[in-house]
Amino acid sequence: DHLEIERAHVVGLSMGGFATLHFGFRHPSRALSLVVAGVGYGAEKEQQARFKEEVGVVAKSLLEEGMAAFAGKYAYGPTRVQFENKDPRGFAEFKRALAEHSALGSANTQISCQGERPSLYDLIAEMRAMTVPTLVLTGDEDWPCLAPALLMKREIPSAALAVMPNCGHTINLEDPDQFNRIVGDFIGQVDAGRWPRRDPRALSASITGMKG
């Protein structure tokens, strides 16, 4: 509203992707399309307790050790080391920029956002009702996002799923050319009026389509 933009293609990664999904739920008439990238951490029911526990550990580390010390550990998580292996210089810049964030702001975000947000598995009704063209995008080594990505693909009638090979969580930084190409192709199809809704026949209780 402040920018006086009536409708837009909305692209978000990680927490931004979660916000993008909710934008589609709440303001579908304002979204030309949605790119929901790297979304799903802590979504699976069996992982929720551990995820909330780790959120508490992260917040405590931020407040007690400060942002620089935290960034030096967090950057080497299991879904971020892929970036270091591909582009050490880019990864070093990522880590430096991360260290400049506010420790208090980051801790509050962990506690009040990450720790309190609903599981994607509790939002299935909202997904099924949404018709905004949606691209679900994830890296194939962004382990916490793989099953939730399949969930969103299955439950959002207007969604497609793209998986970037040998990529972790920071897919827009790890392989910006591929990321931008996938997103650009998607937006181009939407703008051309060629983005389809899924044929209802594509979802069936049958595995082969040949029911006995």
Functional labels for PLM-detected ranges:
Residues 1-8:
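Conserved acidic catalytic loop of the alpha/beta-hydrolase fold
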Residues 10-12, 37:
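Short beta-strand immediately N-terminal to the catalytic nucleophile in serine-hydrolase-like folds
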Residues 21-26, 31-65, 69:
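Flexible "cap/lid" loop of the alpha/beta hydrolase fold
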Residues 130, 136-138:
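Short beta-strand/loop motif that positions the catalytic acidic residue
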Residues 159-212:
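Catalytic active-site module of serine/aspartate enzymes centered on a nucleophile-bearing elbow/loop
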